[in-house]
Amino acid sequence: NLLGRIKLTGGNEKELMKFYSILYRTLLFPRSLKEPGGVHYSPYSKHGDVYNGELSTDSGFWDAYRTVYPLMHLVYPDYAKKTLNGWVNAIKEAPDKMLAQWASPGKVDSMEGAMGEISIAEGILNNAIDDVDTAWNYLYTSTCTSAGREHFDLYAMLGYVPGQVSLSLNYYLSDFVVSKAAEYLGFETIATKLFERSKQWKLLFDRDTKFFLPKSEKGRFPQYTDKTK
């Protein structure tokens, strides 16, 4: 019983109902497409082929990377392993060998960023992924080429995505976590490159307003007449 793995002390009946209702909904997704016979239909493959093993779907990494997946590793490590191996199979079965940042059930990618990189890297660091080669090849391709990230060339050249502060901050965080996976696997050169790139968040911090702000391609912050608003 997944709900029973967390035992609460204190709290009234209403608070307990609220907690376990939220936990129940948290565990509904991502969802497995594996059928009782051990096979699955793949919405990621070009022709909807049938494969063996786990397959994961119905999850958006933009918010789940910092909520659902850490919870799985802490409380449900068996579930985390099954789910992450299902995502690695999704990478294998996709024609471009990339992870859908939002799957429903196939590739939708309606969320910005590449936060799935963080969940896959976390899986490597927690020894929750069986096919580490496929997982790492995805991480390398996604962080070091234009195949995985929108506006990658500008991001690599300028250190940020012009006009998009949220997207840039997402990339910095992904770079940092993937650098830790690279270090763990012994890829020191790539680890150093990504770690240094992750520190470029400083480029978007405006000391006048004390906010992160978007920059133009020429390196300028927007000019506000009233910086208190």
Question: What would you call each of these model-derived segments?
Answer:
Residues G4-L8, I22-L28, H73-Y76, V88-K92, ...:
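Sec-exported extracytoplasmic/periplasmic mature domains
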Residues M98-L99, S179, Y184-K229:
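Catalytic cores of carbohydrate-active enzymes
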Residues S32-V39, P70-H73, K82-L84, T209:
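Short, solvent-exposed loop/turn and secondary-structure capping segments
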Residues N1-S56, V88-N89, D96-K97, D133, ...:
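Acidic/polar, glycine-enriched structural segments that form the non-catalytic walls/loops
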Residues T57-A182, F195:
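Aromatic-rich carbohydrate-recognition surfaces in CAZymes
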Residues G10, F29, E35, T57, ...:
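Generic structural "secondary-structure junction" signal
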Residues N12-L16, K81, A191:
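Alpha-helix N-cap/helix-initiation sites
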Residues I22, V39-P43, H47, V132-G163, ...:
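Extended glycan-interaction surfaces of carbohydrate-active proteins
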